[in-house]
Each structure stands twice: as structure tokens, then as C-alpha cells.
Amino acid sequence: MARTFFVGGNFKLNGTKKSIKEIVDRLNTASLPENVEVVICPPATYLDYTVSLVSKKQVTVGGQNTYTKASGAYTGENSVDQLKDVGAKWVILGHSERRTYFHEDDKIVAEKTKFALDQGLGVILCIGETLEEKKAGVTLKVVERQLDAVIAEVKDWTNVVIAYEPVWAIGTGLAATAEDAQDIHHSIRSYLAEKLGKDTAEKTRILYGGSANGANAGTFKDKADVDGFLVGGASLKPEFVDIINSRN
């Protein structure tokens, strides 16, 4: 089945009002495919501002994190309601940097995912293995474990987009080949079919998220199970438009 091409831009802890305006202006004026969904995720302090700038119909805004409570004494956290209140439609959850630096385990990621979905946000769910896990040959075991935690909590995957991000490729300049990514994505889709049914598996978009850039994005275009990209550093640069247009 045809799944809508999806490109997420994770700005991480980068950007100023000036640089974010430049990024959004580029997207607003660029010639983008009609059948693409683009989600840009600036730091939380700039969410409201970013939403106010976007005019391109293919582009929406998402958060980089949220919490499992609607409100309360949780200093420094962002709530789903607050993200929605400023116009965010999506949130990235389970990113390897959250798992590594902030010790978010599979259970926490699953709880956050369920809460965000229940409150009406779409979720870009990140999964992936470290270099050590890759060398040990346990990539599939790792991503299946990460998926199992969410499958236990979430039954309706309509608003979930999976981002496979090999941790060894993030921000390193290394990238899985398109063939390698296709193999892993196909295995992920097969696992979803086993656990959630073929229909859900066929409808769920699976993105590649390891150092995707303007130079390599085109090599993925004919890979049946690669439905787009979650882009890090390149989302801050003009080549982000090239990635969005890489299916043309």
C-alpha cells in the first residue's frame, strides 16, 4: 500500500529565533511535493514561535519530549496539553539521546507514548541499537524489545510513526546503507505484523534516522519499507529541502 512520505526535522538543542525563521522561510517558499508530511521539532522555547511562522500546508510542528502527567509539580517538564495548546501536532519520544543522557528506559518511553496518543498527539517513536549491540549481532533483539514495551501499552497505532535510528550513526556522519536500512525496516514491519496484525504493519510508517542528509537521501527512494526520514543536523541546513524532495 502507498504510505505518505514523512520527513521529521529534529532541531535538538539548537537554534535561535533568527535561525528558525530562516529554516521556516525556506520551507514556506520551497517547492515541496504535495504528497509529503513534514514535521519540524524545535526546542520547546520556540514551539509557539515556530507554529506562528509556518504557512506551508505540508508542514506541521512537533515537540521533542513530553511527560506522562497533564500538569503539576514537575519542574522542567512539558505537558501534552501545553504542546497542543501552542499548536504542536506531534512529539518525538524514545530518542536515543533521551534514553542515554536522561536514562529513559523502555517502560518510560512506552508510558509517554500511550499518554501522548491518548491525549491526541501523534508520536514519532524512536528505536535503535548501539554500536556494541550491532557488533554483537543483536540489532533485531534490541528493536523488538523496545517495540514490545510500547505494544504492551498501545493498541491503536494509527498515529504512531516509527523512526529506526541506529545509535552508532547519529551525529557521526556514518550511515547505514539503504540496503541495510531496508533489511531492518522489513524486519520491523514483519514483527509489527506478527504482534499487531498485517493491516497495522502495512499502514505504519517506518523512517530512517541515522545521519540522513541531502547527499544520501536519494539512495533510499526505491526501498519499499523506508517511508521517510527523521533528520537531525541536516534539518538545520538548506539541504533539508533536498531530503524532502528526495523522492522526486
Curated annotation (Swiss-Prot):
Isomerase keyword on record: yes
EC code(s) of this entry: 5.3.1.1
PROSITE patterns per record: TIM_1, TIM_2
Record: active site: 95 (electrophile), 165 (proton acceptor)
Pathway field: Carbohydrate biosynthesis; gluconeogenesis; Carbohydrate degradation; glycolysis; D-glyceraldehyde 3-phosphate from glycerone phosphate: step 1/1
GO BP term (any one): canonical glycolysis
Group of enzyme by EC: isomerase
Record carries keyword Isomerase: yes
Residues where substrate binds: 10, 12
Top-level taxonomic group: Eukaryota
GO molecular function: triose-phosphate isomerase activity
Reaction it catalyzes: D-glyceraldehyde 3-phosphate = dihydroxyacetone phosphate
Cellular component aspect of the GO annotation: cell surface; cytosol
Keywords: Gluconeogenesis, Glycolysis, Isomerase
Pfam families: TIM
Recorded family membership: Belongs to the triosephosphate isomerase family.
Subunit structure, interactors included: Homodimer.
Name recorded for this polypeptide: Triosephosphate isomerase
Taxonomic placement: Eukaryota, Fungi, Dikarya, Ascomycota, Saccharomycotina
